[in-house]
Swiss-Prot record:
GO terms for molecular function: ATP binding; ATP hydrolysis activity; proton-transporting ATP synthase activity, rotational mechanism; proton-transporting ATPase activity, rotational mechanism. SMART domains: AAA (SM00382). This is ATP synthase subunit beta 2. It is a peripheral membrane protein. The gene is atpD2. Keywords: ATP synthesis, ATP-binding, Cell inner membrane, Cell membrane, CF(1), Hydrogen ion transport, Ion transport, Membrane, Nucleotide-binding, Translocase, Transport. Produces ATP from ADP in the presence of a proton gradient across the membrane. The catalytic sites are hosted primarily by the beta subunits.
Length: 474
């Protein structure tokens, strides 16, 4: 590696004494490197990070690069410092790996500094305690699950329910319609998705306000374990030095926990429940607590959380839940019904949905919507057995409102225009609340449910109904 972040000032030499997969034991006769020090072998092509000092002369390190070609007896150089990430205005619009090397086939950015990826969370006195709503332009989130500026939201779901699509739409809305920086951190996900995201953001013209950092699934566990810290270091620079608001999107936080589990197993630690590392809570807290709202700016984080086998009692999901101000659960059933985004409003929750923060009108509307959807969920079994006709008129009205609300809360995304042939829609909070309120007042009782599906503002439903009548008459 040739970047300035990993050069040694006064190298201390060690020698490899053991290689077991990604775990490397190194002997130093004079100076034992501290924990988190980066070591180079094979002329800098193999990079490892010290995780344990075994005795007065031996350290155990985890490889951040593949260890092919590494052998006992090879010399190892102590760089004298930790893993570092590039920061500065020059990193905008660029794509990096965990070492700060550019991976977008463009020259290295000028005017950058290098900072350690191991940084303490902001002090309690510096944290801001104001509760502000972060508007996304996505109806179902802004109305029922308002996100917190400087908070953490999790997108929980199994494979293929739309977590990555929802993340990319939020990037589009944040960069295109708000003055902020977006940092996308890909942890252990598919290389294809990263490349597609880069091209999509470039085509959308939002790349100048973005930074992308990737440690993909083909890379060693050490690399996937550290890439989240590298992305956070960049986010902290824009918050603290540039006084900008940052949207940090992590896809996927489960892969960070999974990489930590692999590292823990390789280091010989006793596994905990379901094979997870015993230090999972500490490792996750070390990452999550750095995401904070301070007096100089805010880092708002939205994290995709893969749920193994859709089991929400999995320790990885349980530990992640405890750090979040909003939990957005994506439902496979809703996805199969074509209700996108496939967010389950009854399973999802937000700490911001209180009258003191969002206001009395918004809170009352959100509660009424939840109540209507919950009543519909209870009536579904009766409808399946006896049919809609067997319900009382009052219950039939509830079902009609709930079905129209479900369809109104769907939304065409900018990032899926090429697949759906529907133009993307950004909906203001006021328009979304107005639409839900009018549906609950039965203003659209005569409107077919299909007219409310995949629209932006509620008035588009009337236009669709008129178009349908004109087509039918002609």
């Amino acid at each position: 590696m040739t970047d300035g972040g990993l050069q040694a000032d006064a190298p201390h030499l060690g020698v490899v004494v053991s290689v077991r997969g990604s775990v490397v034991d190194v002997r130093f006769d004079t100076h034992l490197p501290p924990i988190h020090t980066v070591l180079h072998a094979d002329e800098g092509r193999i990079i490892v990070e010290v995780l344990a000092q075994r005795d007065a002369h031996h350290v155990r390190a985890i490889a951040l690069t593949p260890t092919q070609g590494l052998a006992r007896g090879m010399p190892v150089v102590d760089t004298g410092g930790p893993l570092k990430a590039p920061v500065g205005k020059g990193i905008l619009s660029r794509m990096f790996d965990v070492f700060g090397n550019t991976i977008d086939r463009l020259p290295a950015p000028p005017d950058i500094q290098w900072r350690s990826v191991h940084r303490a969370p902001p002090a309690l006195a510096r944290r801001s305690t104001r509760s502000e709503v972060f508007v996304t332009g996505i109806k179902v989130i802004d109305v029922l699950l308002p996100l917190e500026r400087g908070g953490k939201a999790g997108l929980f779901g199994g494979a293929g329910v739309g977590k990555t699509v929802l993340l990319t739409e939020m990037i589009h809305n944040m960069v295109g319609h708000q003055e902020g920086i977006s940092i996308f951190c890909g942890i252990g996900e598919r290389c294809r998705e990263g490349e597609e995201l880069y091209r999509d953001m470039k085509d959308a013209g939002v790349l100048p306000s973005m930074v992308m950092v990737f440690g993909q699934m083909n890379e060693p566990p050490g690399s996937r374990f550290r890439v989240g810290h590298a992305a956070l270091t960049m986010a902290e620079y824009f918050r603290d030095d540039e006084h900008r608001d940052v949207l940090l999107l992590i896809d996927n936080i489960f892969r960070f926990i999974q990489a930590g589990s692999e590292v823990s197993g390789l280091m010989g630690q006793m596994p905990s429940r379901l094979g997870y590392q015993p230090t999972m809570g500490t490792e996750l807290s070390g990452l999550e607590e750095r995401i904070a709202n301070t007096d100089s700016g805010a880092i708002t984080s939205i994290q995709a959380v893969y749920v193994p086998a859709d089991d929400f009692t999995d320790p990885a999901a349980v530990h992640t839940f405890s750090h979040l101000s909003a939990s957005i659960v994506l439902s496979r059933k809703r996805a199969s019904e074509g209700l996108f985004p496939a967010i389950d409003p009854l399973q999802s929750s937000s700490k911001m949905a209180t009258p003191g923060i969002v206001g009395e009108r918004h809170y009352a509307l959100a509660q009424e919507i939840r109540r209507t959807l919950a009543q519909y969920a209870q009536l579904k079994d009766i409808i399946a057995m006896l049919g809609l006709e067997q319900l009382s008129p009052q219950d039939r009205n509830v079902v009609g409102r709930a079905r129209r609300l479900e369809r109104f809360l769907t939304q065409p995304f900018f990032t899926t225009e090429q697949f759906t042939n529907l133009p993307g829609k950004l909906v203001s909070l006021e328009d979304a609340l107005d639409g839900c309120e009018r549906i609950l007042r039965d203003e659209f009782k005569d409107c077919p449910e299909s007219a409310l599906y995949m629209i932006g503002k509620i008035d588009e439903a009337r236009a669709r109904k008129t178009e349908a009548i004109d087509v039918h008459e002609s």
